[in-house]
């Protein structure tokens, strides 16, 4: 499923050889993607990977996969709520490229899964096929942008942090299971921000010094802090002033309000 696909797509890209995808479980959205998330020298990185010439997904196989794997695929898709909100807010603040066509494709995948949750859980063949189709669509969305922006936001960043094991030990959880946790953490925080905006108590301030101390304590002991700083240079937050962010709060509010309620996602 996901891990084997990522490794295969990465090797295919490195050696410039064709790649055919045969997913045996509807567990992640990386089957048709052109990027792969790999742990490299202690760091989690999105690396170039080969997109498949063909995807052969047999319902008789992936539809009978362990339900835990299927649930992980559902969670990977539901995480797009956060990814798309992140992208829209970033575009609002920094004029980052934002493609409505890609967003519509990813939203279509989201709706396809959301509207068939009970049927997917029951293992109904048609619903399981829709889940697989949604996962492939999400991979195509990444192909269209050339990166993982439409499919990966704060919810995946949390997963990558956990995968690096700088704050925690090894987690015996599937990628999609960790995405579900990351989605809930991000959603709860977003709703807190929306509530503060609504009550006019939302204050924007910088945590640069506190962030530096945290990064040193968390990543310094792993010996990857310098590499992480180099990977993330220049500092993108330097493009956004606290005044600019404060002024944008009224426009950010409806983006957050469009996210599902925390109780619905639970």
PLM regions with names:
Residues 9-12, 75-78, 180, 184:
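Short, well-ordered alpha-helical packing segments
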Residues 8, 29, 64, 161-162:
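Generic hydrophobic alpha-helical membrane-span motif
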Residues 1-20, 119-131:
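N-terminal small/polar loop signature for handling phosphorylated ligands or for N-terminal nucleophile
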Residues 4-6, 27, 34, 180:
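Short, electropositive, low-hydrophobicity segments enriched in small/polar residues
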Residues 1-2, 30, 73-75, 139, ...:
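Glycine-centered flexibility sites
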Residues 105-265:
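Active-site segments that bind and position negatively charged phosphate/pyrophosphate groups
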Residues 13-112:
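A glycine/threonine-rich phosphate-anchoring loop and its flanking beta-alpha core
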């Amino acid at each position: 499923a996901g891990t084997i696909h990522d490794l295969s797509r990465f090797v295919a890209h490195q050696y410039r050889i064709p790649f055919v995808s045969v997913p045996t479980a509807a567990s992640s959205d990386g089957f048709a993607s052109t990027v792969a998330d790999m742990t490299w020298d202690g760091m989690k990185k999105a690396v170039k990977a080969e997109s498949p010439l063909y995807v052969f997904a047999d319902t008789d196989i992936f539809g009978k996969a362990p339900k835990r794997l299927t649930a992980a695929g559902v969670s990977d898709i539901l995480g797009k709520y956060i990814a798309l909100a992140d992208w829209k807010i970033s575009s609002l603040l920094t004029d980052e490229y934002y493609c409505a066509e890609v967003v519509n494709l990813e939203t279509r995948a989201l709706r396809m899964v959301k509207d068939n949750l009970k049927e997917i859980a029951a293992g109904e063949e048609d619903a399981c096929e829709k889940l697989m189709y949604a996962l492939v669509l999400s991979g195509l969305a990444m192909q269209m942008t050339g990166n993982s922006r439409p499919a990966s936001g704060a919810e995946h960043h949390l997963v990558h942090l956990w995968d690096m094991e700088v704050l925690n030990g090894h987690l015996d959880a599937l990628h999609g299971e960790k995405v579900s946790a990351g989605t809930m953490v991000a959603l709860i925080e977003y709703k807190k921000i929306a509530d503060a905006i609504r009550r006019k108590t939302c204050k924007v301030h910088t945590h640069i010094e506190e962030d530096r101390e945290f990064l040193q304590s968390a990543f310094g002991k792993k010996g990857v802090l310098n590499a992480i700083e180099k990977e993330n240079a220049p500092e993108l937050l330097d493009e956004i002033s606290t005044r600019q962010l404060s002024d944008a709060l009224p426009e950010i509010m409806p983006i957050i309000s469009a996210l599902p309620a925390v109780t619905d996602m639970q």
